[in-house]
Amino acid sequence: MFYIKTKKKFKNNALEIKDIVKKLKQLNYVEDELTEKVEQNIDFAKRHLVDTIYKQAILEGVATTFADTESIIEGGKVNNMTSEDVLKIINLKHAWEFILNKNVILSDTNFALLCEINKIVEQGFYYTAGKIRNVPVTIGGTTWKPDFPIESKIKEELEEILKRNLDDVDTAIELLLYTMKKQIFIDGNKRTSVIYSNHYLISRGKGIIVIPAELTDEFKDLLILYYEGRDEKEIKRFIKEKCYMSI
């Protein structure tokens, strides 16, 4: 049995989020108020938070149930789960709380934000969390390997995506797939990418994207085809039709 002691083990999390918010304010934050649509979207995301985190955990291969995920998020106790899997769920909760913070939702969906999300997602796993990887990685199910990420190039390509003449949902999908394929960090790239693209959507009051648990295998198959450059259209259609939820 693994007892969840989030208040004790992660008592500094709120202070860490405040520090991150302060850093983001120094980078790009402008004092403003949330629109009614964005406030509604934040409430929508909060109402679906347990379900969203459960689905992200399944995508990550975490051995959890909806009930166990809910218990962990609420600070309860669970049976037959590893401490690593529990921590992944707790970190997802903290990452979502971070992007749903008013100051953060008003910040740009940029490279700095992407790094901060990964730092939270990978807290307690890698000391390099939130930093660009400098080691090669392999992807299960394919011989394709991503190039080493270059910060200046990533910033440039993210800006290029944001400047395209696309609607907000299509832009969010492009951000999600780009950051997944680049494998920018040593670990947690899918979790980071989903939350990052949702920051963009929510900041515009356009809903959320999450991969349904029952469609995880289909999504992974399409993702491999996308990585290999064999089919880019199908996964975008799949996400828009089966993973996107409007408010």
Where are these regions (language model features)?
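FIC/Doc superfamily catalytic core
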Residues: 1-247
